Amino acid sequence: MPMEKTFDPAAIEAKWARLWESRGLFRPHRPDATPFTIVNPPPNVTGALHIGHALDNTLQDVLIRYERLRGKDALWVVGTDHAGIATQMVVERQLNERQQKRTDFTRDEFVDKVWEWKATSGGQITRQLRRLGCSMDWSREQFTMDPHFTRAVVKVFVDLHKKGLIYRDKRLVNWDPKLKTAISDLEVETHEVQGGFWHFKYPLADGVKLDDGHDHIVVATTRPETMLADMAVAVHPDDARYKSVIGKFVELPITGRRVPVVADEHADPELGSGAVKITPGHDFNDFEVGKRAGFKPAEMLNMFDGDANVIQTADGLIPAEYLGLHRFKRDGIDGARELVVQRMKETGFLIPHTDKDGNAHDAEPRTIQTPFGDRGGVVIEPWLTDQWYVDAEKLAQAPIQAVRDGRIQIVPKTWEKTFFNWMENIQPWCVSRQLWWGHRIPAWYAEDGRTFVAETEEEAQAEAGAGVILTRDPDVLDTWFSSALWPFATLGWPDDTELLKRHYPNDVLISGFDILFFWDARMAMQGMEFMGEVPWRTLYLHGLVRAPDGQKMSKSKGNVVDPIGLIDQYGADALRFFMCAMESQGRDIKMDDARLAGYRNFATKLWNAARFCEANGIAASTSLEAPAATLPVNRWIIGEVADTVAAVEAAFAAYRFDDAANAIYSFAWDRFCDWYLELIKPVLSQKPSPLQGRGLGEGDEAVPAPADGPLSPALSPEGEREIAETRAVAGWVLDQILVMLHPFMPFITEELWTGLGDRADYPLITAKWPAPNAARDAAASADIDWLIKLVSELRTAKAELGLPPGARLTAHFPASLKDRADKLAAQLDRLARLETISFDPAPAGASAQLVVEGETITIPLEGVIDIAAERERLTRALAAATKERDSLAGRLNNPSFVERAKPEAVEKARTDHAAKEAEADRLSAALARLG
């Protein structure tokens, strides 16, 4: 059946996604081949595909398809994360819509409802990954709450506890007062908030005074409410103003608490008064200062409950009027902050701020970087609480060494410094969460306070004794704890499965740099602890996908791009190719509709090239090796294929997705479609060149050959051989393009592969990567490269001189080019559109000079154009372009503009300057051609 005239991405995408999966072509099925394994970073089961997912999964699929074509036993592990907080919130919102809440149910009843939600609504993102063309092994789809995965999680927790690497401790956590749980740093977003900077007097106790005679220390704070739990005032040890009072005490207003003045380098002598209030129970920096000052976490004061309402501190010094107040003003009711400021003002301990107009205010206005929970949407409270922690410092040592000795390669290498800096200063990892949905912590408590950690309740009971009443820990594990086991638990661990033996370690992990520490590093820790080997040999970190103006995408900015919408508009192949072509190591990607449209056009061009081949009797190749060829154009294109294969392979080896994509793009569009198919048209049609008989070569007269079917009996044997050779080479080259392009654009390439040949039982996805055994033919390459340069120069000259592309001109060649011109007569006639080629000296007068590889070809212009008028037009245009170019250069050379203007304005000026500079150069060249 002939190919459709137009390319319809939607139709072929649905067809091939279904056929590939139904035929099991995504599964590893080559037991004797070298395995190649990637695990997909498990997206949240609640999630929808965002543009970052599209980039991440496209890069993985490109590698999987590439290695599959190279004959490896490729496994791409797919699955979803149970996403504790996110999933619990989704289900709670559904309950709220029915005027119900989570606490209306028992824990088990609520968890059952979450499982019901997953069964009906939890597969959106996996359906979207299929639309992107991801060739994951869907038959082994994983979920982090599956029974076998849960068994692995519990075993890891218990084993780490036995080794002393998991323990319970009192430390500060990011507490979300709305969700009432600790959250990870990744779930904290920092926003700029307009707030205040209050200055308070803290009286020195026991009659002590500063050297300047003052009886108080001035402290400044953005959180006045936390003074109710202050435990110290810190000053820099070298700050001469306070040396005499280090070790003395201040008596806090409101509470009357005596707190020491401590020396700590955290205090900055250049900032404010140089003294800072220390609240270890509600500030991460203060927590560390407090520990250095000798306070144990158990002694640190906590003034908030889980709702961020004021509670009494352990010393009982907070006045009753503050108890029960929220930390901030809420619903029109003053909070602890407002009341503290009011009391400090009333008692004379508030130092007002005077603005530039002389007006007094309680606080100095400040823009404050404030942490918010990304899901709860409220300000995070650093909160002192008992949680479970992993001794990350000990677990980090093996991955650090693995990166140092090269067992783990981080690409780009520039990320190694960041990796080492974080891992070498790693803090204990809080792994407990106050949720109902998730992996329940396998710990049970006896009434006497003893803790029993075991894989089952029966084991815990046996350890505690038959008569001991046990209560299970109500918390669940951090989602990152379970997903850290992904590289080996998905392969069957803790069972010693064949899949685990074959596919661990994984080969490569593709990850966004933003989860390097939350997921990647923790996988390395757990993998090396429990498997004794690195989880993957290469860690590739990509950047962000940004809005067209370079801003980070966010819902609040309204600049989020839906990848499914892009697939609907441009096709999955175009989106995938865009992601790869733009993926340059260490750089973010800017969305660009023009480029997306360009890659959609690339798919259309490939489709049309295949239609041309079909219409001209060019069929699928039957050989992996290049056909025998004698014609220079065929020998040239075979060499170009070999060079392109080598370039693509080198790019993949270096994880240069952009170089690989651009190499095949350049070859397919430029070399094959724009040049080769044009160059072989004279061969396929066998029309004698009108230049024959003018010294350009000999040849039998020929009649046009039919596009398909038997060759004309009037055609010479040599003509028949040339057509057959050219069809074979063209078919083989198109096959190599389809194979090389398949990892990037799987849908259109599979459709063309099957449509151009009887290969229904030999799909492209399982074909073989090109291995051309032909080297570049230097002579053929030199001839065709020269021809391409000549035609390009001639086309440029026509455009510059305002001549139509089809204008036939006379050209004077140097005698040294006669043999080459004879050999390429047919191609010169078709592509160069020359009326006459002469080897005599050019006549005097205006002419265009084309310099190709050091040889000058002259095109007389007398009688072709109005020389004087054209010179005048070009002179005016050049003056205008030069003026605008110089004006833009002046702006760009002005530091005031470059430093103060919006980045997008500066970038536009640079782009415009480059365009005007190129225009001026082009016009100058055109003037020079006129002589």
Swiss-Prot record:
CDD domains according to UniProt: Anticodon_Ia_Val, ValRS_core
UniProt keyword list: Aminoacyl-tRNA synthetase, ATP-binding, Coiled coil, Cytoplasm, Ligase, Nucleotide-binding, Protein biosynthesis
Enzyme class: ligase
Residues engaged in binding ATP: K555
A Gene Ontology biological process term: valyl-tRNA aminoacylation
An annotated Gene Ontology molecular function: ATP binding
Domain of life: Bacteria
Catalysed conversion reaction: tRNA(Val) + L-valine + ATP = L-valyl-tRNA(Val) + AMP + diphosphate
UniProt-listed Enzyme Commission number(s): 6.1.1.9
Record PROSITE patterns: AA_TRNA_LIGASE_I
Motif ('KMSKS' region): 552-556
InterPro entries attached to this UniProt entry: aa-tRNA-synth_I_CS, aa-tRNA-synth_Ia, Anticodon_Ia_Val, M/V/L/I-tRNA-synth_anticd-bd, Rossmann-like_a/b/a_fold, tRNA-bd_arm, tRNAsynth_Ia_anticodon-bd, Val-tRNA_synth_C_sf
One Gene Ontology cellular component annotation held by this UniProt entry: cytosol
Biased composition (Basic and acidic residues): 353-365
Region described as Disordered: 351-370, 691-717
Protein localization: Cytoplasm
Pfam families given in the database record: Anticodon_1, tRNA-synt_1, Val_tRNA-synt_C
Residue numbers covered by motif 'HIGH' region: 43-53
Coiled coil region boundaries: 864-930
Complexes and interactors: Monomer.
Record-stated family: Belongs to the class-I aminoacyl-tRNA synthetase family. ValS type 1 subfamily.
Function: Catalyzes the attachment of valine to tRNA(Val). As ValRS can inadvertently accommodate and process structurally similar amino acids such as threonine, to avoid such errors, it has a 'posttransfer' editing activity that hydrolyzes mischarged Thr-tRNA(Val) in a tRNA-dependent manner.
Domain notes from UniProt: ValRS has two distinct active sites: one for aminoacylation and one for editing. The misactivated threonine is translocated from the active site to the editing site. The C-terminal coiled-coil domain is crucial for aminoacylation activity.
Name of the protein in its database record: Valine--tRNA ligase
Natural source organism: Sphingopyxis alaskensis (strain DSM 13593 / LMG 18877 / RB2256) (Sphingomonas alaskensis)
Protein encoded by which gene: valS
